[in-house]
From Swiss-Prot:
A Pfam short name: PIN_4
PANTHER family: TRANSCRIPTIONAL PROTEIN SWT1 (PTHR16161:SF0)
Residue ranges constituting the PINc domain according to the UniProt record: 395-522
Annotated protein name in UniProt: Transcriptional protein SWT1
Species per Swiss-Prot/TrEMBL record: Mus musculus
Source organism, top-level taxon: Eukaryota
Region of interest (Disordered), residue spans: 30-75, 308-340
Compositionally biased intervals (Polar residues): 56-69, 322-335
SUPFAM superfamilies given in the database record: PIN domain-like (SSF88723)
């Protein structure tokens, strides 16, 4: 199609050149004839002639209006034709112009059609040629329309010039005779000229607006038309895509403004009025071309409107998008958090609705699913087949909600406990317990226990996620099954049903229900399920580690257990001892948290009310309810403002030590940590007892801590029997240990107690050294600090404080040197001499006398070595503080002329 159109364009240009040459020859011949008739020739006339030829050539080449220009020059040269111009000559010339143009154009159009037809037969198919000729006809239509308009303007312009020439000619007689008729004709001509000028100007403006841009150059019209034609051809859309285009702009076609439709109609009428003056054949071709151009213009307008619509919509969307991001980041973050809260609220409400419906559990699943539910509990190793289950002995402990929330630490220790006489100890979490924890976490059951429900949920989730074989969960299928026709009236019945189901699933295992609910324990005992509280279970675990009494299970006996499970192979002695020690240590910590928490809460409330009055709750760092860790955090936070004013500042070290050891005990319980906790608690209570008894709370707590210390000493000796003792003697001693603990016997049976007491006395000397250094350094700092308003310092003068600071720095340096030598990896007996010489030199405690060997034995113990490490770190911090204080007052001391050798003692 491109080849057809290009060849057609080339042929059109060739015929245009031939047509122009012929018209120029004819005009030259007519001019030669007129020159022969003329008698006078002037150089001015020759110049006008040349200008006329140039203008005629340009106009004829562009628009084909050569005859008008030649006739015009003939009127200027011939004076005899002026009288008859208006009557005959004018009409004949108009006819000549109108007839001349269509003849030439008809020949041109027929030639182009013939050439295009030949080219189509030789080069391409008929369809391709038809498309090419159609495009060329559209272009010719546009060019002829513009040419007709320009011809109309040239005619009007020629009329004006002719009338002016007629007025300028000196013919007096004709003017006088024909004056009235000429005057009337003149007026009519002027009116017609004005009307034609207005019409032509309006038509030209409309054409320019519709077809041509502003400041358009007519000389480049042909080039631009061909270039635009090439662009249209190269981007021509196939017929299939035209349907999609119509679908895209179908709604836009019917939304065009009425003003646009009117302008289209006016343009169409104007084009048709100009085309009616042409020949019939030309008229038909032009009408067809105008229809095609009109359709193309409409399509172009539709595309433009569609593009504008897309542009405006995209711009609007961009503006809206930009406006949405004009808000500050804080509002965006707040909106994001609000959206997240709303989403979480929806999820929680939906979950709460499901939880509410899940109380009424579904009907029993079909037969055959019960055996598959064994797979849901744990994997094959943890849940063997039914045949292999009969030979397994497990201790299955069903945990109630209150135990998980109030004694989670005990549950964690219990999960890691090895019980002799059983293959494994497994914790069972009923389905209803998980539901209750979930609702408590959301605050729907008990709002004040949310902080306890969340850790329990995390513990269960982490254990199941890590596939811990010692924690199972009751599946939904098992919970939905009815047992003995029992209807689940409340959650207690569902927990009890879980115990009965696991008794059936594992008949050779012991199932224990652990709950603090007395009524639920009663139901369990009536139903044949062994039910214990947390305290009772703690004692029972110790009994099971020693006796392995399974009399509550009718299907198993002690002889079968001893025959099936050899204790030497399945339950080692060390494992049983460690399990018993962990349980006892955990019990001691729980008792300490209860009694010490009661005492510290009373102290905190009393001292805060004295300091702040009724506003003490607003000032308080952590609001109740408190744990022991929370109370210690409050003491640390308010020490300077409240407790440091009424107590010694060195007591803060004891509070910090309590806090660190308690955090350590929550992660892993060991004997040394528990012992440090009890000793620090005793020191703290003794210090506060000098101020007040706090309504009798401190004496009771002090007595309970002493009992726990005694029990700890018993545990240390009784759980480490000698290798020569038999297993039976060990079991008897462990049984007596449990009885002693249960009866709170305040008697020490440890034969090594005097040595332990000796070590405590030696350590008390080291503690007194630390307390003396701490108190003296505090007095020095207060005296040297000019901004301090406290007057509790015993040092009166600035000079005395400075001298005392130098002595303290030397003492701390010596103590650190001795402690660091003891804490060295390859330390021996000789390394303790430095510290021992310092203690003897300063005679810190004259009442306590000990040797270097006894000091070495004391610091060689693990617990005292750990304490010594903590003390070394605290002494290093104090040494740095002393150096900073000495450097800050050095210039002032030097200006006062104090002894230089004293200043040289600074490290």
């Amino acid at each position: 199609m491109l080849l057809c159109t290009t060849s057609a364009h080339k042929l059109e240009t060739v015929y245009d050149h031939k047509f122009l040459k012929m018209s120029i020859k004819e005009s030259c011949a007519k001019e030669e004839k007129s020159q022969k008739k003329q008698t006078i020739s002037s150089p001015t006339f020759n110049e006008d002639k040349k200008k006329g030829e140039i203008s005629a050539g340009s106009t004829s080449s562009e628009h084909g209006v050569q005859p008008v220009s030649t006739k015009k020059r003939k009127l200027k040269a011939d004076d005899t034709d002026n009288v008859y111009y208006n009557a005959n000559r004018k009409n004949s010339k108009r006819l000549n112009v109108e007839v001349f143009i269509p003849k030439k154009r008809l020949k041109f159009s027929s030639s182009t059609q013939a050439v295009s037809y030949l080219n189509n037969n030789q080069m391409t198919s008929h369809s391709c040629s038809s498309n090419g000729t159609k495009d060329t006809k559209v272009k010719d239509c546009k060019l002829t329309n513009i040419g007709s308009k320009l011809n109309y303007e040239i005619k009007n312009h020629s009329r004006i010039k002719i009338t002016k020439d007629m007025k300028s000619k000196p013919v007096d007689q004709t003017k006088e005779k024909n004056w009235p008729s000429l005057l009337i004709q003149k007026k009519m001509k002027e009116l017609k000229k004005e009307k034609n000028n207005k019409d032509s100007s309006e038509e030209l403006e409309k054409c320019k607006k519709n077809h041509l841009p502003q400041n358009y150059n007519f000389s480049n019209m042909i080039k631009e038309s061909f270039e635009s034609g090439r662009k249209k051809i190269s981007f021509k859309i196939p017929k299939k895509s035209s349907t999609t285009l119509q679908k895209l702009v179908e709604e836009k076609i019917f939304t065009i403004d009425s003003s646009k439709s009117k302008s289209k109609q006016e343009e169409k009428q104007h084009l048709q009025s100009h085309q009616m003056s042409l020949n019939l054949a030309r008229h038909k071709t032009e009408n067809s071309f105008s229809d095609s151009t009109h359709k193309q213009s409409v399509c172009e307008r539709i595309r433009k409107d569609h593009c504008e619509h897309q542009g405006t919509s995209s711009s609007d969307s961009k503006e809206n998008h930009a406006q949405s991001f004009e808000t500050p980041c804080s509002s965006v973050s707040s909106e994001d958090t609000q959206d997240a809260d709303e989403e979480m609220q929806i999820v929680e409400e939906l979950h709460a609705a499901r939880v509410g419906r899940s109380v009424d559990l579904p009907v029993v699943p079909p037969s055959g699913e019960l055996m598959s539910m064994e797979i849901d509990l744990v994997d094959e190793d943890a849940h063997p087949s039914a045949a292999h289950t009969a030979s397994d002995t497990k201790l299955l402990i069903v945990m109630d909600t209150n135990v998980l929330m109030n004694h989670l630490k005990f549950v964690k220790i219990l999960k890691t406990t090895e019980i002799p006489g059983f293959d494994t100890l497994v914790l069972i979490i009923p389905w209803v317990v998980i539901q209750e924890l979930d609702r408590m976490k959301a605050g729907k059951l008990l709002k004040h226990v949310q902080h306890k429900a969340v850790p329990a949920i995390h513990f269960i989730n982490n254990s199941l996620k890590s596939q811990d074989r010692k924690l199972w969960g009751q599946s939904l299928q098992l919970a939905s099954q009815k047992l003995y026709g029992l209807s689940d009236e409340n959650n207690d019945d569902r927990v009890l049903k879980c115990c009965l189901q696991y008794q059936q699933l594992f008949p050779c295992s012991l199932v224990i229900l652990c709950t603090d609910d007395r009524n639920l324990r009663t139901k369990g005992l009536i139903s044949g399920v062994k039910s214990l509280s947390k305290e009772d279970l703690d004692t029972e675990i110790l009994n099971l580690t020693l006796n392995t009494d399974l009399c509550h299970q009718p299907c198993i006996s002690k002889q079968q257990l001893n025959a099936e499970v050899p204790p030497a192979k399945e339950t080692p002695k060390e494992g049983a001892a460690n399990s018993g020690l962990s349980i006892l240590l955990e019990r001691i910590i729980c008792d300490l948290e209860k009694c010490l928490g009661t005492a510290l809460s009373s102290i905190l409330e009393t001292e805060m009310k004295i300091a702040f009055g009724n506003l003490w709750m607003e000032v308080l760092y952590l609001k109740p309810p408190w744990t022991l860790i929370n109370l210690l955090q409050c003491f640390k936070k308010h020490w300077l403002a409240v407790f440091g004013l009424v107590m010694e500042n060195n007591l803060l070290v004891t509070v910090e030590s309590l806090y660190e050891n308690l955090c350590k005990a929550n992660k892993a319980v060991d004997f040394t940590t528990v012992k440090f906790l009890l000793q620090d608690s005793k020191s703290l209570l003794h210090a506060f007892s000098t101020r007040s008894n706090y309504d009798g709370v401190l004496p009771q707590t002090f007595a309970q801590v002493n009992k726990l210390l005694q029990v700890l000493a018993e545990v240390k000796t009784k759980l480490k029997p000698s290798s020569s003792e038999s297993t039976r003697s060990k079991e008897q001693e462990d049984t007596s240990l449990v009885k002693l603990h249960n009866q709170d016997v305040n008697v020490f049976l440890d034969s090594n107690l005097p040595q332990a007491t000796r070590h405590q006395e030696i350590w008390s000397v080291l503690e007194s050294v630390w307390m003396s250094i701490y108190q003296n350094s505090t007095d020095v700092f207060q005296t040297l600090d000019s901004s301090s308003t406290l007057t509790t310092s015993k040092i009166a003068s600035f000079e005395e404080a400075f001298v005392y600071l130098q002595k303290l720095m030397v003492a701390v340096k010596d103590i650190l040197e001795g402690i660091q030598r003891i804490l060295a990896p390859n330390s021996n007996y000789q390394d303790v001499e430095t510290l021992y010489n310092f203690l003897i030199k300063y005679e810190v405690n004259k009442n306590v006398k000990f040797t270097a060997r006894e000091l070495y034995d004391c610091v060689s113990q693990t617990e005292y070595r750990e304490r010594l490490t903590i003390g070394c770190r605290q002494l290093i911090e104090m040494e740095c503080t002393m150096q900073q204080c000495s450097a800050s007052v050095y210039m002032e001391a030097r200006s006062r002329g104090w002894c230089e050798d004293m200043l040289n003692n600074r490290p």
